[in-house]
Each structure stands twice: as C-alpha cells, then as structure tokens.
C-alpha cells in the first residue's frame, strides 16, 4: 500500500502525460523480490482504526455539529455509517449482525463525554457546539488536551508558571523530553520540589517540566542536559509547542469569562518562545534577531531603561553592530 501511494505521485498533474517511479535493488535477486512484492503483488487489507481512536471520534462529532451537518444523534450515526469504518462493519458478514448496535453505543458514549464536558450542548434546535467546543473545532489539539486545560482554567485562582507548565506536560500534545538511560532522576525530583511541585513518579513529563522551567530562566540546552541527565536537544521544540498551548489556555480562559489572566499568559507564552525571564521580554520581542543572550547582556550592563545610551555605547557589547544598535536605540526611544 505504501509503495502504491508513493509511485502514484510520479509525474506532475496537468504537466506530465507519464510518471516514473523506481525501486532500487542491491542485487538481481532482490530486484525480483521487489517486483514480485511491490509491483505485481496484491495490496494488503486495510482496516479502519476510527473507533479505536477515541480522539478521532470526538473530533469528527465536534466537526459535524459545529458545521451544523448533524443536529441529532441519528444524524451522527448516519454520518459514521458512511465512513470507511461503517462500510467495513456493515459489509463484513461476521460483523454486520451487531454493527448497528456497536456503532450506536460508540457514538452515544462519545456524545455523553462531550456533553458532560460542555463541548457540545443540547438545545431545542438540536445539538450545538459551545464556545469551548468551537475553540476545539478550530484547533489542532486533542480533546483530551483541551479538557485538561479547561479543568486547569476552571480551577485557577492565579497563574503559577511552574504549575501550568507541569500541567501541560501531562497532555498528549506537548512533545516530551526524555531521560538519558538509567541515570539518576534525583536532580529532577529536587528541582520540582524547589519549584513547589510534587510528583510520586519521575518520568518524561517531569523531565520536560524541569527542562522548560530552566529554559524560561535562561539556561541553555547544554546546561539543562548536564544538570538533569536529559536529552535536551528537543527543548526548543517543546518550548515552542508549550508557548502555543499557553495561548490556547488563554483562549480557553477567555471563553470561560476569565480575562484577568490574559496578560500573565501572554508573558508566559513569550517566555517559553524566547527562553527568557520576564524582565527582558519587551526587548527580545521589540528588537528582531536580538536573541536572549545579547538582550541579557544589554540589561545587565545598562539596565532596563536604555534611553540615555547612544548607539556607539550599545555597540561596545559583543555581537552588537551598527544596524542592531540602531534598532535597539529606536526601540528604547519609542517604548
């Protein structure tokens, strides 16, 4: 099947009459095997995994309701009957007997979950998505992640960056940073404790949490890796995804009517994106390509108010040339 998918892309539609795909063999014997298996062989049976993937079912139901294509459970059942899964269930003699009841049960279970979590609501006009449901429909996040974030948003009385990062590290949408083999996990446990976080088990979510806490406190990947015995090469990616999840958290809170945390969440999102402490956020955001290292040097040497200093003085800092000094000066004068 993979070979058919690949070779089917040979040639450019509307430009080429013929397309060519090649299978490279290391020997004549292998070439014969490849031809027999991939070129002349039958495509292996394909089975739908839709119902096995709970999140896919949730997302399909949300999409159908949000687009007003389905207003009742019966509409949803009719939609799923027309999917590849529905076709396989009804066409298979061994499954067709209980296919209808099985499909109905799965949809009703998923719908009950979505109703309980206020993602979908029942109205006199039929099923409708809530504002939170619309937010999920427009995002790429799993329903599990969205529900976890909503739970946090509902209960939050203030924003603790460390606590929120740990909460996000336990969702399926944040890429995790892993430990190096069987090295000691004690440094991670100790850092969590000093950050006001308690964990019974220390695993990749905890390693990710500690790495991101250190990242927003301006430690680099090398320092994080050596301090906590983790593979820190994916820190930047995890931090970027976490910054986007913080924005989703902000949107979720605003949907719930909690606007008083918006500024704090904007700052935390920026800290994760740039890997900085709060005091240099305006500088790294306001001056393109400055970076956190040079921004920190500037603030450490000149302070946060840069208006009294000339471009020539700024250029004395390593890595800052005339062009960048001009941008910094313009930012300082207009901030």
Regions found by a protein language model. Give the residues of each.
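Helical mechanochemical/support elements of P-loop NTPase systems and associated helical scaffolds
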Residues: 2-6, 17-20, 53, 72, ...
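Conserved segment of the helicase C-terminal RecA-like domain
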Residues: 1-37
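Helix-loop-beta junctions that constitute the ligand-sensing/allosteric loops
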Residues: 303-305
């Amino acid at each position: 099947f993979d070979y058919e998918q690949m070779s089917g892309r040979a040639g450019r539609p509307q430009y080429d009459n013929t397309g060519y795909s090649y299978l490279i063999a290391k020997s004549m014997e292998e070439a014969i095997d490849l031809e027999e298996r991939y070129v002349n062989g039958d495509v292996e049976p394909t089975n739908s995994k839709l119902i096995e993937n709970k999140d896919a079912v949730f997302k399909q139901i949300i999409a159908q309701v949000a687009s007003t294509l389905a207003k009742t459970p019966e509409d949803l059942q009719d939609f799923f009957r027309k999917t590849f899964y529905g076709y396989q269930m009804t066409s298979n003699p061994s499954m067709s007997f209980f296919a209808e009841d099985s499909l109905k049960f799965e949809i009703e279970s998923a719908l009950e979950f979505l109703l309980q979590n206020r993602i979908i609501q029942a109205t006199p006009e039929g099923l409708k998505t809530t504002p939170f449901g619309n937010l999920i429909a427009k995002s790429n996040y799993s329903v599990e992640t969205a529900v976890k974030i909503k739970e946090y948003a509902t209960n939050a009385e203030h924003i603790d960056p460390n606590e929120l990062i740990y909460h996000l590290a336990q969702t399926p949408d944040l890429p995790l940073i892993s430990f190096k083999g069987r090295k000691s996990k004690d440094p991670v446990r100790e850092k969590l404790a000093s950050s006001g976080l308690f964990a019974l088990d220390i695993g990749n979510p905890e390693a990710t949490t500690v790495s991101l806490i250190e990242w927003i406190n301006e430690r680099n990947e090398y320092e994080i890796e050596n301090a906590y015995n983790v593979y820190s090469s994916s820190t930047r990616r995890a931090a970027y995804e976490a910054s986007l999840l913080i924005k989703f958290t902000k949107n979720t809170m605003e949907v719930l009517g909690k606007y008083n945390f918006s500024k704090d969440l904007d700052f935390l999102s920026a800290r994760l994106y740039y890997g900085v402490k709060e005091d240099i956020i305006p500088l790294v955001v306001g001056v393109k390509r400055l970076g956190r290292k040079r921004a920190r040097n500037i603030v450490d040497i000149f302070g946060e108010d840069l208006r009294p200093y000339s471009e020539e003085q700024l250029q004395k800092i390593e890595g800052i040339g005339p062009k960048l000094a001009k941008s910094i000066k313009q930012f300082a004068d207009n901030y």
